[in-house]
């Protein structure tokens, strides 16, 4: 992430899209998607504060330089999806969860406990007032 910011700075651009317009085809940088498949395992495997700090930093700064993050967990508890992570990852998707508590942990609202499975989900985009059911 920092290397990408250093690359953008000499061209006086603020994001990856502007950079890719200014450079030749061979020098363009791709968008990178970082997928953390089991956040609970990562949070429990080492220094929780360090993991939380790294995720927060990526969530705050990385989008401008073409890095996007998907966090997934089978266990949506407040020990895994901390308040700091929730505050910095504003767009959320929830598939079927076991309880209203789990739904609130992910989406800050109930409803995910009533989903049907097979791709049925609630999507809560940045800035929205309510989640949208999609499949």
Sequence positions of predicted segments:
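P-loop NTPase motor-domain active sites and their immediate coupling elements
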Residues: 1-135
